[in-house]
Amino acid sequence: MNDVDASIEPKRIKEVRAYVVKGGGADYHDQSSEHWILGYIATPISIYPEYRASRASWGLNVLGSVVVEVESSDGEVGFGISTGGYPAAWIIENHLSRFVVGKYVGEVEKTWDQMFKATIYYGRRGIVMNAISAVDLALWDLMGKVRGLPVYDLLGGPVRDELTFYATGPRPDVAKSLGFIGGKLPLIHGPADGIEGLRENVRIFKEAREKVGDDFLLMYDCWMSLDLPYAQRLLSELKPYGLFWIEEPFIPDDYWSFGALANIAPPTLVASGEHESTVHGFRLLLELGKVNVIQPDVTWVGGVTPMIKIAALAEAYGAWVIPHGSSVYGYHFIITRVNSPFAEYLVVSPDATKIVPQFHPLLRDEPIPQNGKVRLSRKPGFGVELNRDLLVRPFKST
């Protein structure tokens, strides 16, 4: 038998701190105006001409990053990040912190449940879930550091030796040359651009297919921008060119349009979920929406704790779980799941031709794909360090 001193009390959390950061980091939309991610890309609001030319014009990049540190009674610190800036920091300091301080390190399920239920009346999605995500990720990071284990070991251990990636960005030809297994293009034109815009979307995809060949996965990210008739026609026009999946064609709550599109999509897959929240929301997406691939963002959906349930639900429906972006936070989860066959790398270099860390300059030692693959380290927690020089703490818990 192992000798265990039952009199040793587990470590407790003594403080929660929330910070904001400007310029990249967790909010990767917070970029210069020349960045491809802020350019002419279809969005729900691009039906209005004044908000069509740039995603910055309607404020996609206004929130900024939020960073949470949780400190144990012996001074060990874990941290997590999300999008949310000042509003999320205020919620964390003034509401969520009461459910964290005093808890034992490792009480992640109870803490998450209390944070979620205490914010239902004004939360459930959006910025509140982002705030909960940052806290939850900090708790998992701390638990790994206290136990001397990477988070993926806390989740059951890896099911593969390394992660394989596809790349999101406007240059799938470059992605192929860098060793990625696929590329996901941003859809440029939405319904407001008419039949000419649709034809241009098809032309862009066809040209990309000609450059990368047939042995390369090619997808379209529609970012909630389409209506059902447009999506049906786009899907039909693209079938000759090997569209692997069509992503997030509709707003998250329109499960019925997802279901209607899924009925005619095969062999193309339907993917969605980066803007979905809660296991109940994903149940609707799987039951009514009939999606083949769900894409929760670990830094937006509530953190690692709800991801465990969402992934189990997806497995019951025979669906893949390929989280949206989320870098190292997604990597530690994906490597433990049989139904997560590969991962997304979001190309955040301005012209989408260079491989750089997604959350730069906020994280240090952030792994990036080499020849389209990543082998995770054995460092405890999420295995990255925080660049504290960038942090500003605008509020303190009351």
UniProtKB/Swiss-Prot annotation:
Positions annotated as active site in the UniProt record: H324 (proton acceptor)
Co-factor(s): Mg(2+)
Residues the record lists as binding substrate: H29, R55, E344
Highest taxon in the source lineage: Archaea
One GO molecular-function entry: L-rhamnonate dehydratase activity
Pfam families: MR_MLE_C (PF13378), MR_MLE_N (PF02746)
Gene3D superfamilies listed in its UniProt record: Enolase-like C-terminal domain (3.20.20.120), Enolase-like, N-terminal domain (3.30.390.10)
EC assignment: 4.2.1.90
Note describing how the cofactor binds: Binds 1 Mg(2+) ion per subunit.
SMART domains: MR_MLE
Transmembrane segments: none
Keyword Lyase: yes
Site (Transition state stabilizer): E344
Disulfide bonds: none
Function: Catalyzes the dehydration of L-rhamnonate to 2-keto-3-deoxy-L-rhamnonate (KDR).
Family listed: Belongs to the mandelate racemase/muconate lactonizing enzyme family. RhamD subfamily.
Designated name of the protein: Putative L-rhamnonate dehydratase
Organism: Caldivirga maquilingensis (strain ATCC 700844 / DSM 13496 / JCM 10307 / IC-167)
Name of the coding gene: rhmD
